Amino acid sequence: MSAEAKAGLRRTLRARRAARPPAELEAAGDALALHADALGPGPVAAFVGIRGEPPTLALLAALRARGVRVLLPLLLPDYDLEWAEYEAEDAPLVEGLRGVLQPRGPSLGLAGIGEAVLVLAPALAVDGGGRRLGQGGGSYDRALARTQAPVLAVVFDDELLDAVPAEEHDQPVHGTLTPGRGVTTFPV
């Protein structure tokens, strides 16, 4: 599918996210946290949901409460991702590039994602074949190429689509984590 088709789908999905009421977002974040036990002992590379993404702070707190080591991305000027440990909920996150909330801790570098045994990746949509539609900057496609860990795309339940356009450089995911369905894995 063309880059134009991906751009059109991104516009549609972003508009849908922008229309979600705050109460729905809050409920989605609380529901994601209920699935923390299904994510294993970690370490887990995750992210802080921003700009209409599924809220993940409650999930991160639930993982940390279980003693799971959580890594969060540090967005670089070239849109690549380094990683840092999220050490405590009471340590304020700082706003990085493009509004990405990230820990203050020392960087583990680009290869830091390799310390995770599971990756939770943001996405606008995903399909049952593991095709993930991101924001279009390539940050996660580059980062996911550096890990062998299973990857779950964190999306709203209605963002699991029949088909998502993909290009050769797009990194596949192994399943989804949604507020309503929890963890869903795809046949490999």
Protein language model regions, located:
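N-terminal active-site beta-alpha-beta segment that forms phosphate/nucleotide-binding
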Residues: 1-114
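Surface-exposed, charge/polar-rich loops and edge strands
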Residues: 1-11, 15-20, 65-66, 89, ...
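A generic "cationic amphipathic patch" detector
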Residues: 26, 57-59, 83, 132, ...
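Receiver (REC) domain switch-region micro-motif
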Residues: 44, 119-120
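Glycine-rich, N-terminal phosphate-binding loop of Rossmann-like dinucleotide-binding domains
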Residues: 48, 123, 180
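Short glycine-rich anion-binding loops that position phosphate/pyrophosphate groups of nucleotides
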Residues: 50-52, 124-128
